């Protein structure tokens, strides 16, 4: 099901910049907007701003295609892809994703189908190879008129006395250069270029984790229409993802306490397999698995920046905040914030007096969505959440609201947000009931080793 993207976004109503205005701007700056980073967030912002007639230059540290995790999109990505004009191309390279499933202690899995989401808009998403997906978006930004420079590392961003910024960078050959811009959008992801330079980045003390992951062939898929599901398995000290990709490949990874990962002895591929197989159900699906390429490991520390923007600059996606990816929120939050940022920057360049108000509203909305995901993330491995996910009930449409959250509908849908408040109450009541019931023999979590 597709819906009109204009129903979900504040469309840009103003006209393109006039020739006289552009001529005056050209005298002072090399470009109107400088975007740092060529991932989904950067490409989204660059596409939409270039389409509006602004001069956009994007600097990307690497050369595409390149490997990246974060391969599971959400249904709420679809209207953004449609707005960009790439939905059909993404569908062609992606694996159809109708649901997310969470295996229970009894070995059965519960499939949370997106077509049951409260206020359903789009009833599916796609699993994508990020190398293909990110390159597609970057090439589309070029086609829309953005000036793309790959293998270009940003070294510093300095405010100019006459307004705007001077961005110093260096190419792969070591040659230095600079570009002046009226506005800077930091879409550098976990590089957090401006967050680090301005001293804004703050680690979340309770959200410490690390990830190990790889691609495999021979991993069994869910039967029938569930074949494209993302599966999330619980471990005693973390969780496992399985994301089905094209050509029979399965992305498999584990997110665990970093202290557990420090216990590793021997090869990373063996450690990854042993960790994943710490869940009995995951072990069964990995019985015939063959690793494709080399496994990788990365720190997965959650953080946020103290500020989201200032005069002439703005953070989007992971450049502002990063949360545990258990609900596949990363690419959606990146692209959604980038689309909103494009609207904000367009309006600010036309009327700078609006910037403070627009940035305040932008941050309030993004923090609201991050807060909804974070509340569930912090409680995912608790006995209470395990009980509620294994025994879902749709009283007052609460289950449908949780599915809407899993679909990414965490910003503006009031019926969903109201019922998520009810879910929090149900969680508290369930926690009290479990405490009053007293200790009892713990059920098998089927997560023995990790």
Regions found by a protein language model. Give the residues of each.
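C-terminal helical "tail/cap" subdomain of flavin- and related membrane-associated enzymes
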Residues: 4, 10, 343-450
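Beta1/beta-strand and adjacent pyrophosphate-binding region of the FAD-binding site
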Residues: 25-39
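FAD/FMN-dependent oxidoreductases across multiple families
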Residues: 93, 260-344, 350, 354-360
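N-terminal FAD cofactor-binding segment of flavoenzymes
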Residues: 68-106
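Glycine-rich FAD pyrophosphate-binding loop
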Residues: 50-69
